[in-house]
């Protein structure tokens, strides 16, 4: 699937060249494993790295609505399959390579299915444990996301 050209919608903020950018990073959990995706080569930031389902907080929608939309758009899991959403403690992730500070909102999303349909933003996915995730090339800061959600992930 080819990357669509980004055009901000009315009310949407373009953080592409901004110094600070608020983002969600969702860890999708099904039973005793969680989903990580390998980012597409066509993404502006961190192509090829493994990460949760992430997106800019770039409009005025509520957080739960934004989370459900990202999950549906990026991995094809509808809102009806989301069991719980839990928010972790927000943190800043400095990234000199992109001259950006990410304001990361860690989110745990428990789902009732492991059926995934990727969109263009990811080229691969795996359902993994903590130990399996550590062996992959993780997006900078994703280890902190996992740490801040660890008490819920390991249940």
Annotated model-derived regions:
Residues 106, 117-148:
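NUDIX/MutT-family hydrolases
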